[in-house]
Amino acid sequence: MPQLIEIYRLSQSLFYICSMTELNIIWFRRDLRVHDHAALASACAAGGQIVPLFIFEPNYWQRADTSERQFEFAVESLADLDRALRQRGSQLCLRSGVVTEVLSRLHAQHGIASLHFHSLGNTPAEAEQDRQVRTWALKVGIPLREHTGIQHSISPHSDWDTAWRRHMRKPRIAAPAALPPLSIPSEGWPIASDFGLESDGCPDRQTGGRTNAILQLRWFLSGGGRNAGKANLSITACEATASRLSAHLTMGSVSEREVWQAAMKAQAALVTDGDETFATALHRFTEKLAKRSRRVQASARVSLTDTSLLPVDIHNREEASLADPRLSAWTNGKTGFPLLDASMRCLQATGHLESSLRSLLLSFATCHLWLGPVRPAQVLAQLCTDFAPAMYYVSASQVIGLSKAAPAYIPNPVRQSLSRDPDGAFIRKWIPEIAELPDQYLHAPWEAPKSALSAHGIILGQSYPMPL
């Protein structure tokens, strides 16, 4: 019997040793693709067992500026990535928790040979997480292969545009043709309520994932973007020609370089064909991509001290409580200003709104209603499917008047309404209560005579609010 016990112990020890498989971890973050992925290529070059890891972080999803719509878009993007990995013989390994704790458990249970990832480092929390992972890897002696990306590799004092375009022209990294099978178990897919995210009702939200991103890109480059970025377009026309790629770029379902190269190729073909209108539109689009990347880089150099990621409010506006009627009216699209209310209702239902209208909403809350900027910025962030903390708060601080780069943006909502929605199509779509009003009264219904209002069954203050 003692001999049998000893044999059993030896077999268990051998099993444990064999289970220490020395994993090469590819840690996916906001780069949910297998194409043009430097960290994945680095992990593949290391050979051996490869674990495509994604960690759901409670600390992130429990923030005041995240939401169910963002979570669901991320899960859809991850599911598409999982399908791409399975086509190559592997699959996603899902975990939930604090990143360094998850890595520590994996190392204790299986052994980690190397860790490969793209750094973020654009907000204090992201920079701190990157630092903690580096410290942990150094402490336990694990080789780290950190890929910084364009926004960190270019000095703010360099010729940024030239360097960015040089990076964009580099050949894209090919996706691996095959991957070894996942050698460790994955946790199940979490749901939004696991992180305390409440249902926020976004019936017309776009669907995440690389498959949808590529379809959207092809639509845009094959004719959908013919008028993209053109001056003096109405809101409805802008919506019809928008690329709708921002959320996909945020999650990294497609790389910025992949989109830029596809747009440049299409632009060159259009120039050859003599289609200057469309070629010019794609030029504007690539310039917008550059501006987006520059904003990401700028965010890494902005001093963000508030927990909301906004600089301290130099105007000392009082932060609104959730019960504040002004905040409630603004959040629910009931300010009495039709363009503002239509914009908010559109964002509520779709998760998408062009940037100038987002700025209009935030400016009205903080500069007209004089609400403290933190809560309005958080509410607006929750509604945006393409929310990326670093870029969002850099832009928000400029709109609100907290940036040294520019004064606050304070547009007149009625004047904006007349110029951006002259035929009232956008307002009528989202505010059916006043859809029957003639164009001359639609943008400022409080100026309409009572006879015009009553003729269409409108009672200001009841069927539609008086302006705040």
Say what each PLM segment does.
Residues 9, 15-16:
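Short, positively charged and aromatic/hydrophobic N-terminal segments
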Residues 20-90:
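N-terminal beta-strand-loop-alpha-helix module at the start
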Residues 38, 204-205, 211, 230-468:
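C-terminal catalytic domain of photolyase/cryptochrome flavoproteins
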